[in-house]
């Protein structure tokens, strides 16, 4: 399908950057666990602004133009980036550890790395496969991050991501 062709173009053009973005996410997440300083918390919020902005601009605006609704998806992810920017300046989400959902958080953190394996199991190879810096991966990582540090979280981010996930889930049945 055209969706997978666009996905392949995105992966071919950005794979090196995706590796750097993923490595930065791993380092910043690790920093939140081991040394949750104010710098680490603000750095994670800056990263989330960048990551969601990347999905909005690079993924949807630059590589998903064939989708008639790509502007809507770009706006949606842009709003999430703005919500993280607002959070950066207000300090609303303090990133305080909550070990209550450890198992679920572990599963959610693993999912961005499982997506390529699941794509491969479906017979897709690079560059057609889902990677760690795509909307599904970013959504599950963000939900995992907010659950892991959920003493107080930005509910708007969660509502937006859950709404997107419910709608996007249907594409599993549409695109084969």
Segments (PLM) and residue ranges:
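N-terminal signal-anchor/start-transfer transmembrane helix
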Residues: 20-35
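Hydrophobic/aromatic-rich structural module bridging two neighboring secondary-structure elements via a short loop
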Residues: 38-86
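Membrane-proximal helix-loop-helix units in multi-pass membrane proteins
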Residues: 67-142
